[in-house]
Amino acid sequence: MTAIEYRDEIVIIDCGMSFPEDDMYGIDVVIPDFSYIVKNADKVKGIIVTHGHEDHIGGIPYILTQIRVPVYATRITLGLIDNKLKERGITADLRSVTAGDKIRLGSFSIETIRTTHSVADAICFYIVTPAAALFHTGDFKLDYTPIDGEPINLQKFAEIGQRGVDIMLADSTNALRPGFTKSEKFVGEKLDGIFGRAKGRIIIATF
């Protein structure tokens, strides 16, 4: 979870959860500390979400029991969030966005940009305030053949660079590992081969 604050306004980017370490006995999940957000709930204009992985949406049901604000995400991400909320009997103001949309939340002008990740329908944000311009990449991988057919919009990245960025918050997962990450399309091709060779029933476990 990232909170951006300008004067008396706050926008939250993502709100995930993680699982406890082996020595954290009796703890089922780990969520962010919401105390500052709850204390300043009247300042929060909304939650904007980059993608649907658990470490980016898993905390949303918990924070929405503390504050009532709209949640903005793409269609697939919003569907995953909605399922989590329904499991807990929580109703929320969920608002669908598409890559390329522009959102105005108080003093925050937010542009959504198509990116690619290991989950479909991922976006990143170019956020402009009277004080500074911020680029939040979300989690991303350079994938020109993603499973949803929507490649990363590097042209828009270049345009944003020309407009000016004061702060960039970038994903760095596995950044120190050498080599390149294969396209998600490669995963599908491998699965096709495995399924084709299977002689009996196929059982798939998903998370």
Language-model segments: what does each one mean?
Residues 1-48, 53-207:
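His/Asp/Glu-rich metal-coordinating catalytic cores
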